[in-house]
Amino acid sequence: RAILRKPIDRIGYGGYLKLALQFPEFVDYVESVCNEFRQLYENIKGTTPYCVKRVAVLNCWGKMRAWGCHMVHHALYYKQNYSYAGVIEMLSGAPFEVKFISFEDIKNDPALLDELDVIINVGDADTAHTGGIWWEDADITSAIRRFVWNGGGFIGVGEPSGHPYQGHILQLASVLGVEEENGFTLNYDKYNWEEHPDHFILQDADQPMDFGEGKKNIYALEGTEILVQRNKEVQMAAHDFGKGRAVYISGVPYSFANSRTLYRAILWSAH
């Protein structure tokens, strides 16, 4: 689906070209694949595919690592990574206009958020994937909060906005409606554990959500709708923030079912 939405014009070949001469069937196959790509180009004629919403993946690299921000060594499986890489895989073939923006982009031009419907922040806390120390910048946090409060959507996967600062682990805890327990709030009463399996995001799910490695010690704040919790650890939640909406998901390995759920999460958050 990704190739149909935006045809590629390069096929990577690793190895010595002279070795390919020893395998004429391989050369013939490459020729046939090239012809398939040419046919796609001819049929699509450079048109822009239909896009339901405008989505931006927010990390420290922005456009510099577009589509490759969770890919390690030819996208090989890694236990620490696959629960996040699925988000990028899903976006590549989904009917969205996808951009990759950095925190520096927002710092330099907060108005760029006005051109978006949903922001996605994916990864572990204090990494370039989620932002780390950038979350101490009040200009950036206020711009993102304002974006959601005025009607934008925010999808957080893993430990979004994760950076210990001013008494919070998740700097957008009030937006996401969830926080991570690290021992500092053990004595806080936590009453919100009721699940809402009939929520719009899960309405057509025909199997339980696969969160991959998931996350431990995530709890919901008051007013948050928990979609899935396991052993009193929130795996998926939805939260209204002003006119906007936010969704928290602990992990999204790639699968058809997970893609559908993330698709519905984006639509719900953008409403």
State where each predicted segment sits.
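Structural recognition of the beta-strand scaffold that forms the well-ordered cores
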Residues: R10-Y13, A56-V57, F100, I119-N121, ...
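Short, solvent-exposed loop/turn segments at secondary-structure junctions
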Residues: L17-L19, W61-M64, D105-I106, A125-T127, ...
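Short acidic/histidine-rich motifs immediately flanking catalytic phosphotransfer sites
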Residues: A111-G123
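Mature N-terminal, pre-catalytic/accessory segment of carbohydrate-active enzymes
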Residues: I44-R54, L58, V87-L91, A111-D114, ...
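A short, well-structured beta->alpha microelement
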Residues: I88-L112
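A glycine-rich, often tryptophan-bearing local segment used as a flexible ligand/cofactor-contacting loop or short
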Residues: T130-Q207
